[in-house]
Amino acid sequence: MNPTLVAFAGFVSWSLCLLVLMEAIRTNLVATKAVSANGFTPDNSNLSPFMQRLARAHANCVEGLPIFGGLMLIAVVAGKSAVTDPLAYYFLAARILQSLVHLSSVTAMAVTLRFACFTVQMGIGVYWAVRLFLA
């Protein structure tokens, strides 16, 4: 696989990892009778701050997947992955780092770092979009 497809697969897999983690914790909460099976909200607002951050980190991935994943797939399908390959791993690293920071803290420094990671992703996405239109 080329770097673009590896990054796309990594993005999808990372999103899946966050989902599996969230559902494993939810399953444990139900099994231990800490929360009833129908006692969950989509944003985990009735659970711990970590679970709320996990729900948001997963949602961030799902929200970004059609945009950034779409650009990667367009590049591959159009035979233009030379546009996306050079920055594909940087994109994936910024995505994963954003999620990890999101999970770890909500301090001002963490939010700033998280935003910086997202800014890197947006910059790469805009660059890819422009280059794909011009290619």
Task: Tell me what each language-model feature is.
Residues 70-93:
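Short alpha-helical packing/oligomerization segments
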Residues 40-61:
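Short membrane-interface loop/juxtamembrane segments of multi-pass integral membrane proteins
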Residues 27-31, 80, 107, 111, ...:
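Transmembrane helix-loop junctions in multipass membrane proteins, especially transporters and channels
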Residues 59-73:
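Core segments of transmembrane alpha-helices
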Residues 97-123:
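Interfacial loop-to-transmembrane junctions
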Residues 2-40:
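N-terminal signal-anchor transmembrane alpha helix
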Residues 10-13, 58, 89, 93, ...:
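Hydrophobic residues within alpha-helical transmembrane segments
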Residues 126-135:
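Juxtamembrane boundary at the C-terminal end of a transmembrane helix
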